[in-house]
Amino acid sequence: MRIVAGKYRGKRLYSPSDDAVRPTTDRIKETVFNIIQWDVAGARVLDLFAGSGALGIECISRGAEEVVFVDRSPSSIALIKENLKGIEGNYRVVGADFLGVLRAGSDKFDLIFVDPPFRSGLGETAVCAALDSQRLAEGGTIVYEHSTELPFVPTRDDITVRTKRMGTVTVDFVRRKKTALFAGTFDPVTKGHIAVIDEALKVFDEVTAGILVNPDKECFFTPEERLEIL
């Protein structure tokens, strides 16, 4: 394994000797960081199931503001510390269960990596816990790596998911929906109203039009008719 880009590009990293620990390959790591490359510099990063620390160290190399490595395995913690030798940056290595870490603090993170052992059943639990604990910053992304054979099926409607399949490995980029409320009487609905909504949809994942009724003004259209036009 090596660091793909940034200050420490090309630096070799030690791989785990434990077959149960499955480090992200350089090819997959490069693809992932091509997708999130504009989100890393200055980001606060939480690397859950950190293993060798390769993902978090890649973030340090690319200018992340802070990286917190979390793994409950003593051997993984030792490996992360070994790979961090010679790496300068603002980082912490935490030997603990991911749920305890998510529930105990209040710091928010721009990027949260979730890369548990395949078929452990911990991945979706960690994604949901990261969302429910409010540890994901506004506009932040959860990067969830898992087996292609076990696809991530979202059970909530407040997130958007971008999926990248790479053979036996799939990576989902999960973030909260960006929503907006556009309130007005819309009586009548104008081309200007439609243009504003169209522009908002370029920025937000979901736009809600709130139709108001002015009791002091005679309506041209009923609220139901305005809703149908919109």
List each model region and its residues.
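Nucleotidyltransferase catalytic core that binds NTPs
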Residues: 178-230
